Curated annotation (Swiss-Prot):
Residues reported in the UniProt entry to bind Zn(2+): C73, C76, C89, C92
Chain residues that bind Ni(2+): H2
Example of a GO biological process term: protein modification process
Name this polypeptide is given: Hydrogenase maturation factor HypA
Gene encoding the protein: hypA
Domain of life: Bacteria
Pfam families linked: HypA
Physiological role: Involved in the maturation of [NiFe] hydrogenases. Required for nickel insertion into the metal center of the hydrogenase.
Organism: Azotobacter vinelandii
Keywords: Metal-binding, Nickel, Zinc
GO terms of molecular function: nickel cation binding; zinc ion binding
Family: Belongs to the HypA/HybF family.
Length: 113
């Protein structure tokens, strides 16, 4: 379950930012996650709740913003929507796709005190 190490990394990032930006508590956290990031959202929620106990993010609301997956098709030279990494191009059926969006995991916004 790599979601645990991801949650731990998020808490570490929050602690670093708390020092740099002078806040003491995280009330809410918005994460952008793409469908190609290989992250189980419910597992991440569970792990986040577990690793934030006793930290500045304990009790913080975790909001997930799901990004769409997009790729550039080398077969028809079009930007297309995809749900999985190995989807075929919905326009021409080619599998020669380069992912351009959807494999992200990033902190979008924080609400802090």
């Amino acid at each position: 379950m790599h979601e645990m190490s991801i949650a731990e990394g998020i808490v570490q990032l929050l602690e670093e930012q708390a020092v740099a930006q002078d806040f003491t508590r995280v009330r809410a956290l918005w994460l952008e996650i793409g469908p190609l990031a290989a992250i189980e959202v419910e597992s991440l929620r569970f792990c986040f709740e577990a690793v934030t106990r006793g930290s500045l993010a304990e009790g913080a609301r975790l909001e997930i913003v799901e990004l769409p997956g997009r790729a550039w098709c080398l077969g028809c030279n079009a930007s297309v929507a995809i749900r999985r990494r190995y989807d075929a191009c919905p326009q021409c059926g080619s599998h020669r796709l380069q992912v351009t969006q959807g494999d992200e995991l990033r902190v979008k916004e924080l609400e802090v005190e």
